[in-house]
């Protein structure tokens, strides 16, 4: 019985190693800031590669790590009373990189604008 227990323990330990390596896969940081004049009763719906990851409400932002590689970011407005079409932008995430976008309006359409912030501006936003 002890031999079985030891073998089982060794099996579990070796099985856990690939999971830990997969979880530690390097990626980048994606931040999407919702502009203040977006509309108090509107939500910016953010999708990454076709999957909804956030509904960004007034005063909030999306700030998460995403895997390295090419990703399609799509933003739309909810509720969509004006029948505006979602817009997309492609980002090539590199390990350790930070990618900041602003969700904002242009006419009747919401879009993501790449943002370049200075270190002082990033510190002010707590980034």
At which residue positions do the language-model features occur?
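Short loop/turn and low-complexity linker motifs enriched in small/turn-promoting residues
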Residues: 20-127
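Positively charged n-region of N-terminal signal peptides that target proteins for export
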Residues: 1-6
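Bacterial N-terminal signal peptides
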Residues: 7-16
């Amino acid at each position: 019985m002890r031999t079985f227990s030891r073998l089982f323990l060794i099996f579990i330990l070796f099985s856990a190693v690939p999971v830990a390596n997969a979880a530690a896969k390097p990626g980048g940081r994606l931040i999407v800031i919702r502009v203040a004049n977006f509309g108090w009763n509107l939500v910016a719906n953010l999708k990454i590669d076709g999957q909804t990851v956030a509904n960004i409400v007034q005063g909030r932002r999306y700030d998460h790590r995403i895997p390295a590689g090419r990703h399609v970011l799509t933003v739309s407005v909810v509720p969509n009373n004006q029948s505006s079409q979602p817009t997309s932008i492609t980002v090539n995430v590199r390990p350790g990189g930070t990618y900041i976008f602003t969700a904002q309006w242009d006419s009747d359409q919401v879009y993501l604008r790449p943002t370049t912030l200075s270190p002082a501006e990033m510190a002010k936003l707590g980034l």
